[in-house]
Amino acid sequence: QGQPLRGKHILFCLRGLTKVSPYGIISLMPTVRENIAYTFEYFMLVYRGTLLKVARAVAIIALIALALEVFVFNINFFTSSGYRTINLDDRIQLQRNDEGAFLLTDVDHTLEFSSLNTEVRNIRIDFNADQPAQNIAVKIQFTYSAHQTYFDTTEYTVGIPDASVSTVVDPSKFINLQTAGYVENLRIEVVGEDVSYPILLNGVSLNAHRPFAFNPLRFVAVFGLLLLGYAFRPKSAIYRIRIVENPRKSKAGIIFAVAIELALTTTFLFYGSNLVGVATSSYNYGAWNGTSLVNTFEVGGDNAQQYAMLAQAMAKGQLYLEEEPPQWLKDMEDPYDKGARYEAQKETGEPYLFDVAYHDGHYYVYFGVVPVLLFYLPFYLLTGANFPTAIGVLVMALLFILGATALLDRFARYHFRSVSLGVYLLLQIPLVFCCGIMYLVKFPTFYSLPIMCGLAFSVWGLYCWMRSRLAAHKCGWLFAGSLCMALVAGCRPQLLVLSLLAFPLFWRPYITERRLFSPRGAREFACLAAPYLVVAAGIMWYNHARFGSFTDFGANYNLTVNDMTKRGWNIGRLAPALFAYFLQPPSATGVFPYLQPAPFDTTYMGQTIKEVTFGGIFACLPVLWILPFSRRILKLRISQRSTRTIAGVIVVL
């Protein structure tokens, strides 16, 4: 490392290379165990000081995380330790079941306690844990010295918000109250429409002692966040590790970070979502068949099985779903009228499939077909079972993380050569966790799978294209990149906009420098274009075989909340839509989950179809405000290096 050898280094080297045998012969073949010992000794010799410093910092961070877990996150344990608990079970006037639990029903779901005349710090509503899990909205009202009657929200005041209590999560059963003086009357009511009755209640108590609860997951999460903050502090060593100058260290750091991201994403799916259609003896055991090591089961209801149903139909050589639409749907003059469908279904009592394409008396799936060919059809042909959608979402999410990391690494090593490991990770980590894939992982349904596939194919397509620019043999990389980008059309066609990046990437070498007109350049361009032609031909055949048109994907035949066959374009809906998607400021509150759905108002005197949005892209991403100045930036770049990529870049922007 450019430092003079000292005596201990020379001794270490001699120890690692020589060995004296019983016959006095010097051997140059140390054992594997000796090699490991020598390597460890040398590593400790060189990095002992650094390791001690890091170990000291980790120990301090662990102590801070422990202190936060014990004294901050368990503050209610200490504050409630001196409370005098009052049990109200003998005042509850509800029926009991055979086990002695009170029964809250859709008729009788209110508890009222009068003449308490006591100080109330908290309430414990002890719902029985041996019942189906649900989050119950509870409305609490009380009277005290400042209010002789129950009070609620008015024009100028905000009343007591509803509390969310889980039947299976004990900490949620404790509700802290902010009262002034003694409470005289107390009213507890179960509210909300999506409540499953009856609800089993063990009892109600006031001023209950909160138990001490050490949460290992929370401790590890806080410890990890503190470690992350320490690793990215301004004077951290990771900012001195250059991506290009220190390839081994930088690659080790990137691999370590990616491994953690993959593990967190996998854990988040299996333990953060209730839509994973996989069961074992210890996971989703309620749906386990009792014999197999792993079995799959349906989640999300009948309307969430469209891909599985399409795979079953394809296995029989047909493109429409096997389920036969009801006769009343076939007899309707306009089956796409939501109100008319509702009345016909109400009259006949026969259900129909929602959110599928209906055409010429058959159900079709209008979502991209690539996920079916990639996951569902092979799985069904091999096992005879439906492919668990959540596993497909997870696989593509992991591939997206790997592809995004590889793409950023490519940019860093070949286009921004002075980037440090710290700056790289500061870009890579938000890209992975803030790009929206965590929502798709949390909601792993067939709605999420084509989007996740499109994102994964896009980043790998861009990576292959970038690799081709400096590769000696470009054809393979160009073909692989274009194949990935073309397959996006069979997943989420809207993401095909990323294919426009081909213009700034390949305009200069193939058009400006006229490489296209050389034999080798023509072959490369053919590899670039061929996958698009092949995939387009396949999708156009698929469209024509179903709907008689090469360009009709079937979305307009969707049995949804509005008649899309008559929707059309109307300029009156354009202004509110542009504002909502580009300029609408986000709506935030001071309590979790902080970001709320943005309001949507319009003066268009007709039906407007909308989905929940959380703010316009320019309001949420101020970095995009640079776009009006993009032409000046491009002029500066073209003055420094004359190319004809400007048109392509403007198109992409």
Predicted feature locations:
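Start-transfer (signal-anchor) and selected internal transmembrane alpha helices
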Residues: I10-C13, K19, G24-N76, L217-D302, ...
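Interfacial juxtamembrane loops and adjacent helix segments
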Residues: G300, A304, K316-F367, V432, ...
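Transmembrane-helix motifs of polytopic, lipid-linked glycan transferases
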Residues: A385-R417, W460, C464
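Transmembrane-helix signature of polytopic, membrane-embedded enzymes
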Residues: A404-G436, A456, A472-G476, Q640-G648
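Specific aromatic-rich, kink-prone transmembrane helix
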Residues: C453-L470, M485, S499-L501
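Short hydrophobic alpha-helices at membrane interfaces in multi-pass membrane enzymes
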Residues: R467-A486, R520, C527
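Perimembrane helix-loop-helix junctions
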Residues: V497-A536
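Hydrophobic, aromatic-rich transmembrane alpha-helices
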Residues: A598-R641
